[in-house]
């Protein structure tokens, strides 16, 4: 018996049903990699950030997430280079979907019980997505903006429903807009922490404050 089409599980009808000690025997999700590209790139290297945002309240299968990830990555590697971007999948398939298997062979009516005891067995996993929630995000340099938008446009065809491509005003994956980020960086208020930054506050323990002030003055 083949896999049931994902259109049967498109809508969020029931409560979240995650894997637990009560829900065992769940198949592994098809998507296993959620960050790819130049993951270790400094926060200063990739100021551009583009999101693929869902426009519907629905469920996306782990197979669809994997297909979208592969499609986006393949286009960017071919047109930009493998070290010119960082893709991050923003959804994780935690919701378990079930299937009540029915026999379709001859004499099946004597073997199966129909809708008696119809609570199905786990079949796969999906991610529940809300309206306005990012599905995947890409950070890169400003010169690759057109290529990043085209890669996300191609990835849209792997998902059901409607999606929008949103060019963020923020610097990379940080929470600061570009003007604010550059201003805080000039003041020495930001400390690089991988693909994000940590803010150095004006308040706190006196020793920590003196240490931060000394570093800012040295900068």
UniProtKB/Swiss-Prot annotation:
Question: What GO MF annotations does this protein's record show?
Answer: structural constituent of ribosome
Q: What are the entry keywords? A: Ribonucleoprotein, Ribosomal protein
Q: Which GO terms describe its biological process?
A: translation
Specify the domain of life of the species encoding this protein: Eukaryota
The UniProt entry's GO CC annotations, sorted and at most eight, read: ribonucleoprotein complex; ribosome
Q: Which Pfam families match?
A: Ribosomal_L16 (PF00252)
UniProt record similarity statement: Belongs to the universal ribosomal protein uL16 family.
Assembly mode = Component of the large ribosomal subunit. Mature ribosomes consist of a small (40S) and a large (60S) subunit. The 40S subunit contains about 33 different proteins and 1 molecule of RNA (18S). The 60S subunit contains about 49 different proteins and 3 molecules of RNA (28S, 5.8S and 5S).
State the protein's name: Large ribosomal subunit protein uL16
Species annotation? Bombyx mandarina
